[in-house]
Amino acid sequence: MWRPCGSGTVYHDLGNVNYTYIVRANGTVDYDAVLSPVIAALNAIGVPARKNQTCDIAIGDLKISGSAQRMTKGRLLHHGTLLFSSDLGVLDQITTRRKNDCFQSKGTQSAICTVTNIREHLARPMTIEEFRERLLNRMVPP
């Protein structure tokens, strides 16, 4: 899927959790400001997440989340994906470049990286529904 705010390939399946922030902006793109609450929420529920050099969220060297931003009219739209229990085999198949690609992308070139599912790194098993609820409760004040 192509996003008007840039970034590379976005993969969606039933094991994927998406989030979006729309906030007032001061004219600068600040990934730390919007990724910090996501990372703090993940850490609070036992996911050892951190921001990597390319502003993705990772566990160690394995990517679990990508995101993109767009600023317009004093507002910042930031949205991201979280791989909870995605089918990584399908993800690999559709993101692997083939010699005979029949189209040329106008979007941002996707970075090649190794990914993992969050579920594999939890101290105790939980469903995607429980994960979503716990994440939301940590990211959004009551």
Residue ranges and their predicted role:
Residues 14, 59-61, 72-73, 86:
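Short acidic-glycine loop/turn motifs at beta-strand connectors
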Residues 16-18, 54, 63, 77-81:
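Broad gene-expression machinery/nucleic-acid interaction feature
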Residues 51-69:
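Beta-rich nucleic-acid/ligand-interaction surfaces
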Residues 1-29:
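N-terminal lobe of the biotin/lipoate ligase/transferase fold
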Residues 28-44:
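Long, well-ordered alpha-helical scaffolding segments within enzyme catalytic domains
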Residues 8, 57, 116-119:
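Conformational gate/switch positions in structured elements
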Residues 38, 45-47, 65, 73-142:
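Long, positively charged amphipathic alpha-helical accessory segments at protein N-termini or as interdomain linkers
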